[in-house]
Swiss-Prot record:
Signal peptide: none annotated. It is found in: Cytoplasm. InterPro entries: PRA-CH, PRib_AMP_CycHydrolase_dom, PRib_AMP_CycHydrolase_sf. Its EC number is 3.5.4.19. This is Phosphoribosyl-AMP cyclohydrolase. Homodimer. It comes from Acidiphilium cryptum (strain JF-5). PANTHER family: HISTIDINE BIOSYNTHESIS BIFUNCTIONAL PROTEIN, HISTIDINE BIOSYNTHESIS BIFUNCTIONAL PROTEIN HIS7. It catalyses: 1-(5-phospho-beta-D-ribosyl)-5'-AMP + H2O = 1-(5-phospho-beta-D-ribosyl)-5-[(5-phospho-beta-D-ribosylamino)methylideneamino]imidazole-4-carboxamide.
Length: 116
């Protein structure tokens, strides 16, 4: 049976929906990635977050090679049904660069500034 969130979600023309990962206990925004119906279903059934990699064209199980997994605490669908919020327990850095989160470049009037 298809989970109701998959039925309610408004996927784009490629069958994807943006998902924002947020540390459940601090509220820190960690990253944004894409999910499809299969990755949503897997995340809900296993409790480990799974995304869809657009560059590789396949499921991307977060932390599969790095060990920096995300345990799904809660999943929320926004009011328009076109974005997911994943409340997660992050193990290690969330960003592939090794940064704790993917939002470490502040936009200023003069350009970009790296922040911790």
């Amino acid at each position: 049976m298809t989970h109701p969130v998959i039925t309610a979600a408004r996927f784009n023309e490629a069958g994807l929906i943006p998902a924002i990962a947020q540390q459940h206990d601090t509220g820190e925004v960690l990253m944004m990635a894409w999910m499809n119906a299969e990755s949503i279903a897997e995340s809900l059934s296993t409790g480990q977050v799974c995304y869809f990699s657009r560059s590789r064209g396949k499921l991307w199980r977060k932390g599969e090679s790095s060990g920096h997994v995300q345990r799904l605490v809660e999943m929320r669908l926004d009011c328009d049904g076109d974005t997911l919020l994943l409340l997660v327990e992050q193990t290690g850095p969330a960003c592939h660069t090794g940064a704790h989160n993917c939002f470490f470049r502040r936009v200023t009037k003069d350009g970009l500034e790296e922040i911790a």
